[in-house]
């Protein structure tokens, strides 16, 4: 609260995480004096837009996996769980570590459940993506920074939100 007038929340987080993180930020801002209502809130939102829901999830699953590899677990997953990310389950972490140990990043990607991808990204059909981005807005995000999972999705994502 005493350093800036806004925040950019990181990628691969759910709207529920966003609510929790913004509560922590608001409490801190109120302690240190700035008016939280004047804060700008941006968030990087991983998106995958396809006509087929499963295809969309598979296209962005790698991004979720990068946050759950053995090196990143303590730096990324741990803090997210402490803030209240409901889609990362402590009991799954040994399974992810084992999948990575046995199959590298490809093994880990295959081990990431759909629930993780659906929970921490805005992915699916165009209607699903639009609805999910609205959930981030409802959680307090004023500036959604949409990041497509694949280059071929960029124009479609731009067109979807240009309407």
Segments predicted by a language model, with ranges:
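An alpha-helical appendage that flanks or caps ligand/catalytic pockets
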Residues: 18, 23-135
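Bilobed periplasmic-binding protein-like "clamshell/Venus-flytrap" ligand-binding domains
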Residues: 70, 119, 142-148
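Structural preference for beta-strand elements that scaffold enzyme active sites
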Residues: 6-8, 38-44, 142-145
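Ligand/cofactor pocket segment of small-molecule handling proteins
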Residues: 3-18
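C-terminal helical cap(s) of enzyme catalytic domains, especially alpha/beta-barrels
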Residues: 18-28, 151-163
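Structural motif
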Residues: 2-3, 139-140
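Active-site beta-loop-alpha junctions enriched in small/polar residues
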Residues: 12, 44-48, 149
């Amino acid at each position: 609260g005493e350093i800036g007038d806004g925040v950019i929340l990181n990628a691969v987080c759910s709207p529920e995480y966003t609510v929790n993180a913004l509560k922590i930020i608001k409490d801190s801002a109120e302690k240190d004096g700035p008016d939280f209502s004047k804060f700008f809130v941006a968030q990087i939102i991983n998106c995958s837009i396809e006509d087929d829901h499963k295809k969309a999830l598979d296209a962005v699953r790698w991004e979720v996996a990068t946050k759950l590899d053995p090196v990143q677990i303590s730096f990324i997953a741990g803090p997210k769980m402490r803030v209240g990310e409901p889609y990362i389950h402590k009991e799954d972490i040994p399974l992810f570590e084992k999948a990575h140990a046995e199959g590298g990043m490809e093994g880990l990607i295959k081990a990431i459940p759909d629930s993780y991808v659906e929970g921490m990204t805005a992915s699916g059909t165009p209607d699903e993506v639009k609805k999910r981005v609205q959930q981030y807005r409802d959680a307090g995000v004023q500036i959604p920074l949409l990041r497509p999972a694949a280059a071929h999705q960029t124009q479609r994502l731009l067109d979807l939100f240009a309407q």
